[in-house]
């Protein structure tokens, strides 16, 4: 297999493994698969689990798509590639749990190639994972970042710090002056050594369940009421704001004529906004603000 096909094979297997693990922990709902084709080139398989015992909605999509001209969002940082043809493959997921004590999470791993006259002129990896709690626990955040740091360790002493910082900077809502959650890892435009970079992509993809599932198991049976549920729905609004205003993957998908149902799969099934909402001083809800700033968790 060539490089692209090797990455593609890994990603389809990763989607299968994550789906099996999430179905097992949910115990009730199953993923429904939607196979789709893209007119300009390629396609994918979108899987969505809804109304489960643990997950209100869990979406995970695999795609392998191509086009004749790079959209602006993809060539903004690489102007020399403007107008090149391209092919991209990736797995992207967002899980929205029902219980407000279980954090929402997002992960993405992807590979991109640009071509001219049938020759690959550039290729790079990107991805990461991040956590968005509504009622955070220090031990959960520390576990999340410990897994991230451990998987980064074989790739150099600076890898975790650099990609954690990138995550904090990327998942930041400037109009709210807060991070989307407690961070994790984020990287893009990783290139130079295919085997080493592909190994890192696999470490991130494989490490996601190690980071997330123990938190789900610890919090999924926590007792909650209407107050916690209403706060969860309110905070989900921040997720919508980020994805529609800032997220490069969403912008790339829409600009490149992607499948809107799959692109917007990340949005929560239920959400609310409330004008001028301010949590009660000293409350658990007010405490969340202390976590929405970059900090060293380990």
Curated annotation (Swiss-Prot):
Q: Which cofactor does it need?
A: a divalent metal cation
Question: Superkingdom, according to UniProt?
Answer: Bacteria
Q: Where is this site: Important for dimerization?
A: 175
Q: Which GO terms describe its molecular function?
A: coproporphyrinogen oxidase activity; metal ion binding; protein homodimerization activity
Subcellular location(s): the record lists: Cytoplasm
The enzyme's main class, written as a single word, is oxidoreductase
Q: What does it catalyze? A: coproporphyrinogen III + O2 + 2 H(+) = protoporphyrinogen IX + 2 CO2 + 2 H2O
GO BP annotations listed? protoporphyrinogen IX biosynthetic process
Q: Name one GO cellular component term.
A: cytoplasm
The UniProt keyword set, sorted, is: Cytoplasm, Heme biosynthesis, Metal-binding, Oxidoreductase, Porphyrin biosynthesis
Q: Where does a divalent metal cation bind?
A: 96, 106, 145, 175
A single Pfam family it belongs to is: Coprogen_oxidas
Cross-referenced SUPFAM superfamilies, in alphabetical order? Coproporphyrinogen III oxidase
Q: What is its quaternary makeup?
A: Homodimer.
Q: What does this protein do?
A: Involved in the heme biosynthesis. Catalyzes the aerobic oxidative decarboxylation of propionate groups of rings A and B of coproporphyrinogen-III to yield the vinyl groups in protoporphyrinogen-IX.
Family affiliation: Belongs to the aerobic coproporphyrinogen-III oxidase family.
- What name is this protein filed under? Oxygen-dependent coproporphyrinogen-III oxidase
